[in-house]
């Protein structure tokens, strides 16, 4: 019996369902464009087989292991390495067994839908993973991973991915992107400039990062001008390796518009380590404005992922480091926070700043009205905790009336779990098709327009 319903996410009403199905069929086979995510470029540079099912489904995916941790499974038992270098559980079969036993916890969640889709459509599995069949399915997947058809590049091609963007720190040497480029492989994997480590004074090792920033760029980062020049240098380096965007994961959307002398004084104070929390927020905000001005110069699209309370568990952060499933949504202001930046660049039609939020309460009140007015702003798709059927539906319902469809930017999967990419894009295409079918059947959109919008999204 298939794990996935062919009519999943479509409306119950027959007329709406038939139209949603037709809309979906018109876009289902379009190539996947993945403009923001966290896949490891080493997969495509080396094109070595994925080691085992646990390394593919569990270890890299904090959507998965955070659920298991919430049910009392120790993180180390899931193969996650500690910050001090100690390895977690090394036996992939034990990790897989934890996962199989926990599979019921994913019922009704988007992760459960993505996992079912991956097991069925990538590996041909038609039974629900459980403790009873854990070893049988493990052996089946492991056998498939040993074949050429399941190497990273082959999967990339079978997933019909047109382009995939990874995300690298400003200090990254991009060696794996260089190797991909030199390999002659035709798959398009590009990088994205993520400068958080050298623009956020609260980022661990910030001062050491700034020193390294100066070393790799040859700029005098003791000065404000030299520091900005270092960013321009790295942005150019990233562009050479395919980057089309920068990405900024800030705790808030706060921006600043300081004078040159004010910025110099603040930067000196930041480097001294004798700054306040308000100084750190002001500096992050000034750097968003500086990055926007640089985007006007070099053409990089700017993505702002604001409002995540990073590393909420001190215990997990201390033991295992960042990006371990303990980043939590927080309330986020955009109207007041973005005004300093918008006063500088908001009316620039040749600049694209994509706003993402984890605070759904601001969809209709703040970000849709902003993007529906300022030519520099676009709305990013539902992000992280909200890239689900219900999340996409809420997003469309609360933003379309004010911002329309063409002030949004389509879908991105934002994933570390490679096999979930087709599943996530499938959910997005189905969800948008369902929403469009509702607009048509309630007389708010012509059917011909709905098919055109579906293609454009």
For each feature predicted by the language model, list its residue ranges.
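C-terminal amphipathic alpha-helical interaction region
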Residues: 302-304
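Active-site loop ensemble at the mouth of alpha/beta enzyme cores that anchors a bound cofactor
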Residues: 317-329
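Internal, well-ordered alpha-helical scaffold/interface segments
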Residues: 339, 365-368
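Divalent-cation-assisted or electrostatically stabilized phosphate/pyrophosphate-binding catalytic cores
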Residues: 332-337
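Hard-cation-handling environments
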Residues: 313
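Short, basic/hydrophobic alpha-helical segments
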Residues: 340-345
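Metal-cofactor-binding active-site regions of metalloenzymes
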Residues: 2-33, 37-298, 347-361, 368-457
């Amino acid at each position: 019996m298939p794990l996935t319903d062919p009519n999943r996410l479509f409306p119950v009403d027959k007329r709406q369902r038939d139209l949603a199905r037709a809309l979906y069929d018109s876009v289902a086979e379009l190539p996947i464009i993945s403009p923001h995510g966290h896949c490891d470029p080493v997969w495509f540079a080396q094109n070595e087989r994925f080691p085992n099912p646990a390394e593919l489904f569990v270890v890299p995916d904090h959507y998965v292991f955070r659920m298991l941790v919430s049910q009392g499974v120790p993180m180390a038992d899931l193969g996650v390495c500690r910050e001090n270098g100690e390895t977690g559980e090394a036996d992939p079969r034990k990790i897989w067994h934890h996962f199989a036993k926990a599979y019921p916890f994913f019922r009704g969640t988007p992760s459960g839908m993505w996992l079912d889709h991956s097991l069925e459509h990538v590996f041909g599995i038609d039974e629900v993973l459980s403790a009873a069949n854990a070893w049988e399915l493990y052996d089946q997947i492991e056998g498939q991973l040993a074949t050429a058809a399941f190497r990273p590049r082959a999967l990339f091609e079978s997933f019909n991915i047109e382009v995939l963007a990874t995300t690298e720190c400003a200090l990254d040497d991009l060696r794996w992107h260089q190797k991909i480029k030199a390999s002659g492989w035709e798959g398009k994997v590009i990088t994205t400039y993520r400068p958080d480590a050298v623009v956020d004074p609260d980022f661990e090792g910030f001062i050491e990062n700034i020193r390294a920033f100066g070393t790799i760029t040859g700029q005098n980062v003791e000065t404000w001008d030299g520091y900005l020049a270092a960013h321009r240098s790295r942005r150019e380096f990233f562009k050479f390796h395919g980057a089309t965007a920068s990405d900024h994961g800030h705790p808030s959307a706060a921006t600043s518009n300081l004078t040159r002398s004010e910025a110099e004084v603040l930067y000196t104070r930041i480097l001294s380590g004798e700054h306040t929390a308000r100084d750190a927020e002001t500096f992050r905000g000034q750097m968003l404005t500086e990055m926007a001005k640089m985007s006007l110069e070099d053409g990089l699209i700017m993505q702002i992922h604001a409002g995540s309370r990073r590393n909420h568990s001190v215990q997990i952060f201390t033991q295992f480091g960042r990006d371990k499933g303990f980043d939590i949504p927080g309330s986020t202001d955009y109207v007041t926070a973005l005004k300093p930046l918008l006063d500088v660049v908001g009316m620039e039609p040749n600049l694209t700043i994509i706003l993402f939020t984890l605070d759904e309460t601001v969809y209709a009140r703040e970000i849709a009205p902003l993007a529906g007015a300022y030519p520099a702003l676009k709305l990013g798709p539902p992000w992280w905790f909200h890239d689900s059927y219900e999340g996409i539906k809420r997003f469309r319902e609360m933003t379309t009336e004010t911002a329309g469809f063409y002030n949004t930017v389509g879908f991105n999967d934002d994933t570390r779990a490679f096999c979930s990419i087709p599943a996530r894009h499938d959910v997005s295409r189905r969800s948008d098709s369902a929403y469009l079918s509702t607009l048509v059947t309630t007389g708010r959109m012509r059917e011909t327009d709905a098919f055109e919008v579906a293609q454009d999204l």
